[in-house]
Structure formats: C-alpha cells, structure tokens
C-alpha cells in the first residue's frame, strides 16, 4: 500500500514572521492562516502596528524570518520571476514618475510573462483595455497617467492588477485617494476579483468601518503582533466590538439594515 501523503494547505498561511529594523522588531512572530482561497482579508491596526511592513515582507521586499505560504508553496523559495507571477503588490504610491498612458501602465502587469525586449501581444493589449473598462477608465486609456486624478490613478493601478492575474494580491491602503463613491467601487471590484477569480487578497485598510463592510476576514495587528483574527460575517457583534475597541479605543457596533434590506454593522466611536 502506498503511504498516504498530506495535501499541501490551501489558501494563505503566514508562519512566525519577524521583521527587524536594526535591533528593533517591527513584526514579531506573526502567524495566521486563511485556509480557503477566494477571501478578501483586511489588515487592520493603528499607525506603526506593522501593516505595511507585513505586506512588504510577504511580497519579498524586506528581509525577514519565518515564511509565507500560498496553497502550500513557500513564497520565499520562489525565483524573482516566479514570485512576480504569483504576487501582485500595490504600494500606497505607485512610484510612476515618467510619462506613460494609462494603457501602458496597465500593460506593465504583463511584464512577468514577457521575455527581455518582448512586446505585449494583441491579446494582452485587448485585456488591458478590458481591465480599464472594468474599473471605469475606458475613456482614459490614452491619457497620460501623470495627469489623472489621485483616485483615477488608484483605479488604473487596480486595472493593472486585474491584468496581472496573480493568485495573491497585496494592497496597501488602495482606497487612500478615493472619494466615497469610488471607495465603494474599489472595494466592490476587489471583492468581485477575489471571489470570482479564486484569488486571495491581503488589503491594508485604515478605516475599520470599511473593512467590516467589505472584508471576509480581518487580521488585527497591535504592537507588531496579531491581536485578533475576526470574521465579520459570522462573529457576534459583541466579539467584533471588543476586539476592535481593544486596539482603537472605545467604540460601538450597531446592527443596521440599509435601504436595500442588507444587514450591516455601523461603527460609532465613543
């Protein structure tokens, strides 16, 4: 009889992740797992709790100990090219400072699949235009990226992420430059991308109310460690309230029904 092998764990697993700047540990032994793909994971915590550091470490941009696994594959073991095909990282600032059209920015998402000096194919160009249409920027495809508004730039970078088609998305406050309407659009697009595409997204969010409303799972950081892992759809409001209040200070969560009949939680600081 052949020995049975244990299948690799599905989803995202962060194991004992530690990041140091000099002698100071910014993250210390961070561990959590989300064993089901297709989840939008909100990363919460006050300024300085290590949210951005965690994203950068998972993206392979910071030296660290511990490891991150996606569907059983250790990200730290991947080549630079393979890691770029597996992980799509979106920082708070795009870093783009040269004149490129919005379409050209989206086409950058295909770079990990192209050889040296290889140009995007016609199919890639069509996919880039479709991604821009999805985020509502079809009419901006030929416009210089640098002339777009802050919110349009964020949506353009999201279109690049759609084109990239990586299984793991790491996004650092993608809503930071968006108005109320576009924040809702951004989170709805992210949820659709994750849920229909079977992807896993770890999203750093500044606003716990937005995270409660849009995320499937919340990982709350405090002092460089994991304070709580929460499930907004199933955890009792009292559990969510206590965990968030321990990090953000006094607050109250009130179950409400919106005008469309959806049950939601309103967050009120006290």
Q: For each of these PLM feature ranges, what is it?
A:
Residues 44-46:
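The feature captures the beta-strand-to-loop junction immediately N-terminal to the Walker
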Residues 59:
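Helix-to-loop junction immediately C-terminal to a conserved catalytic motif
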Residues 66-74, 83:
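Conserved ABC transporter NBD signature motif
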Residues 107, 122-140:
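Conserved ABC ATPase "signature" region
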Residues 144-148, 152:
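Conserved ABC ATPase signature
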Residues 169-173:
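Catalytic Walker B motif of ABC-type/P-loop ATPase nucleotide-binding domains
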Residues 237-270:
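ABC ATPase nucleotide-binding domains
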């Amino acid at each position: 009889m052949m020995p049975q092998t244990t299948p690799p764990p599905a989803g995202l697993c962060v194991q004992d992740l530690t990041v140091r700047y000099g002698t100071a540990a910014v993250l210390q032994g961070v561990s959590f797992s989300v064993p089901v793909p297709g989840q939008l994971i909100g990363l919460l915590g006050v300024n300085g709790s290590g949210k951005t550091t965690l994203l950068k470490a998972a993206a392979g941009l910071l030296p660290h100990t511990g490891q991150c696994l996606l569907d059983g594959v250790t990200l730290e073991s991947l080549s630079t090219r393979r890691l770029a095909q597996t992980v799509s990282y979106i920082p708070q600032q795009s870093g783009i400072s040269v004149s490129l059209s919005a379409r050209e920015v989206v086409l950058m998402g295909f770079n990990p699949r192209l050889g040296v000096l290889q140009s995007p194919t016609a199919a890639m160009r069509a996919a880039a235009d479709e991604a821009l249409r999805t985020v509502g920027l079809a009419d901006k495809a030929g416009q210089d990226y640098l002339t777009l508004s802050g919110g349009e730039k964020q949506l353009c970078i999201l279109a690049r992420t759609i084109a990239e088609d990586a299984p793991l998305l790491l996004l650092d406050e993608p809503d930071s430059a968006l108005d109320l309407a576009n924040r809702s659009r951004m989170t709805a697009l992210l949820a659709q991308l994750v849920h229909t595409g079977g992807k896993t997204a770890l999203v750093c969010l500044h606003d716990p109310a937005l995270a409660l409303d849009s995320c499937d799972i919340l990982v709350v950081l405090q002092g460089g460690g994991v304070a709580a892992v929460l499930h907004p759809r199933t955890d009792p409001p009292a559990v969510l309230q206590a965990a968030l209040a321990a990090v953000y200070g006094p607050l109250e969560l009130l179950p409400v029904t919106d005008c469309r009949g959806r049950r939601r939680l309103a967050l009120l600081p006290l």
